Amino acid sequence: MKTESTNIIGKADGPTSYFVLSRDQKLTLKQRIQKTRFQLKKKWIEKHIAAEGHTMDEVCKYVQERYGFREVSGKSAGIQYEYEEMRTSFMITHAPELLGEYAKHPELKGHSEEEIREFMAQVEDRKEVARNVPKDKFDIDFHKYEKKMGDTQMHIIIEKKYDYIGGGASGKKTIKEFDKVFKDVYRYYGVTKEDIVNRTKRYDMMVRTLARR
């Protein structure tokens, strides 16, 4: 089985996953150490960050010219599925008013199996309503870039309208290489002086991305 890594970064909230955790769950010693290292690295990055931002169009050009990624045809079934899933997720985040009675995010009332099943069913119903909203009411500017290396691959997804960058890779060695590439791409995307002054989401996501292992 191939090892796979996925990174999801962006100025705006992207594809949404739901995790139900126990309230009394505690961090392990290893997790506490990792958290401390992350916080220290985050502070160092914040101290040295510079205003060198680029546009999404420039980022698209950068991943192709610097790393040899190629854009995947938007006509393929796989790309159409990914596009629809992202459009649904972004609509729920940025235009919930289009969902009518499903505009409000469902609430998890408790942690019993029945309550969790009910919550997940409501989440799926909401997504289905979003899928049926016409594209002329809400749409995204989705692009996927891929680089294949034998039986492994890495890919970067860029959504220009909401300034989203994400991606992933398969294969242990490829994952390590991808992490370096992804951080460099996000570093190139960068931040503006306004982002630094106002501590925008773009600023926060860049710091968090670069602070990861």
What residue ranges belong to the model's regions?
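Amphipathic alpha-helical packing elements
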Residues: 2-29, 35
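Conserved mixed alpha/beta catalytic, RNA-binding, or beta-rich assembly cores of soluble enzyme
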Residues: 34-213
